[in-house]
Amino acid sequence: MIRTISSREVYRNRWTRVREDVIERTDGQRGIYGVVDKDPATIIIPLEATAEGEFVYLIEQFRYTVGGRHIEFPQGGWEMAEVDAEEMARGELREETGLMAEKMTYLSTLQIAYGVMNQQQHVFLAEGLTMGEAEPDLEENDLVVRRVSVQEFEGMLLDRVIVDNCSVAAWGLYKVWRERDKLNTDLHRCR
């Protein structure tokens, strides 16, 4: 196991902290490891079932770090040490899309990029959606909300229109959860 010898913070703002750790590897050699500390976040799959089929709501926004506009599920975090994950998910959903959910289902907690960052992301399914007024942050003033069919969404994944790893992972998790839920429902019907 890698052991931490020392740690020092090299940068901080209200969203991110960066530290450099001096480490000792299992073979006894020392080195450094850069770690990005971020507070927990949420990602929300806003799913709407209608007579015409199933639809998801997506966000299109400019992502500064990669220099372009990208499409993804609503996601983000709050700059607070302790906050309820579902409360944060409901807040992010309302803030970015204007949507309010009658039902929120917790699916899992994922590590976003544990090779460099310790941030966790709580994954929620939002159903029973009602449209309200979006309240984006200053950094999100260019958000565009899109409602697309599940088939169109999955096509966007395969065509690399959506490349956000968190959205791809959340959708894969949802698909597995949904299949397991269907299987459990079918098993209960057989009894």
Where are these regions (language model features)?
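Nudix hydrolase/Nudix homology domain
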Residues: 2, 6, 69, 117, ...
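A short coil-to-beta-strand element that immediately follows conserved catalytic motifs
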Residues: 3-4, 100-107
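Acidic, metal-coordinating catalytic segment for phosphate/diphosphate chemistry
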Residues: 6-45, 51
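Acidic pyrophosphate-coordinating catalytic loop
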Residues: 9-13, 64, 110-122
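Short beta-strand micro-motifs in enzyme catalytic cores
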Residues: 17-21, 31, 55, 69, ...
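Short, well-ordered beta-strand micro-motif
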Residues: 20-22, 46-48, 125-127, 147-149
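Active-site-adjacent beta-strand/loop module that shapes the phosphate/pyrophosphate-binding cleft
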Residues: 22-27, 113-133
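Conserved Nudix-box catalytic region and its N-terminal flanking loop in Nudix hydrolases
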Residues: 33-39, 45, 52-91, 139
